[in-house]
Amino acid sequence: MPLLKAKPTSAGRRHVVQVVNPDLHKGAPYAPLLEKNSKSGGRNNNGRITTRHIGGGHKQHYRVIDFKRNKDGIPAKVERLEYDPNRSANIALVLYADGERRYILAPKGMKAGDAIQSGSGAPIKSGNTLPMRNIPVGTVVHAIEMKPGKGAQIARSAGAYAQILARDGNYVTLRLRSGEMRKVLSDCRATIGEVGNAEHMLRSLGKAGATRWRGIRPTVRGVAMNPVDHPHGGGEGRTSGGRHPVTPWGVPTKGKKTRSNKRTDKLIVRRRNK
């Protein structure tokens, strides 16, 4: 997809770089697959901030995405590709032979009119979903389950993919984009190909306001705060913080391991690249 660099007609347009996809549907989304998407402003039920840097932003509907892809043996046709404000990837509206419509993540190269299907008997073709025990070693996949039947959790953002490296008993070994190699049950499903819209990372919003439209508030440096607000705060004049970098709660923020699920450590063959 081409990148469009805006003309510098104003300071806010000067640095804008947009991803242009002429194949995206220009009308309204499919209403039966929309849900209310309430904003929390990063607050919990007590009104306290539990996640910083969240607030404002344009109103959005949530598009219900089929991450399970469990309509086995029923062929489907891609009706159209759509923009989804809730994720970096584009989505595709597919019509199944029994009349049901669902949204799925749009893989690279998918276009309107393509035929897809799910199940262990589906051909090895981009957009088809199969249990990984039926996918050849070396195949690039996305939308990968971590538990059979739970729905895709790995490799769902724009341009994401993983590669099946080996099959060992009830497990397959995957290499993720991060460099991590991990085992996943071979009954877990994955979709062939990589997620589309890989150029998403090349875009430039151009101004702070465009980030605010997306519901993201500014991030203030700890050294610019007062001592009551952050361990790096305070001091006479400008300081470097006076200690190794930490979070507002005093946890080291560069290099400290924060993974705590030791039960599944055995499934990680190699940690991600640093």
Swiss-Prot record:
The keyword Ribosomal protein applies. SUPFAM superfamilies: Nucleic acid-binding proteins, Translation proteins SH3-like domain. GO terms for molecular function: rRNA binding; structural constituent of ribosome; transferase activity. It comes from the Bacteria. Keywords: Ribonucleoprotein, Ribosomal protein, RNA-binding, rRNA-binding. Disulfide bonds: none annotated. GO terms for biological process: cytoplasmic translation. Residues 39-48 have a biased composition (Low complexity). One of its GO terms (cellular component) is large ribosomal subunit. It holds the Pfam family Ribosomal_L2. PROSITE patterns: RIBOSOMAL_L2. InterPro entries: NA-bd_OB-fold, Rib_uL2_dom2, Ribosomal_uL2, Ribosomal_uL2_bac/org-type, Ribosomal_uL2_C, Ribosomal_uL2_CS, Ribosomal_uL2_dom3, Ribosomal_uL2_RNA-bd_dom. Residues 28-54, 223-265 are annotated as: Disordered. The keyword Ribonucleoprotein applies. One of the primary rRNA binding proteins. Required for association of the 30S and 50S subunits to form the 70S ribosome, for tRNA binding and peptide bond formation. It has been suggested to have peptidyltransferase activity; this is somewhat controversial. Makes several contacts with the 16S rRNA in the 70S ribosome. Belongs to the universal ribosomal protein uL2 family. HAMAP family: Ribosomal_uL2_B (MF_01320_B). Part of the 50S ribosomal subunit. Forms a bridge to the 30S subunit in the 70S ribosome. This is Large ribosomal subunit protein uL2. It comes from Alteromonas mediterranea (strain DSM 17117 / CIP 110805 / LMG 28347 / Deep ecotype).
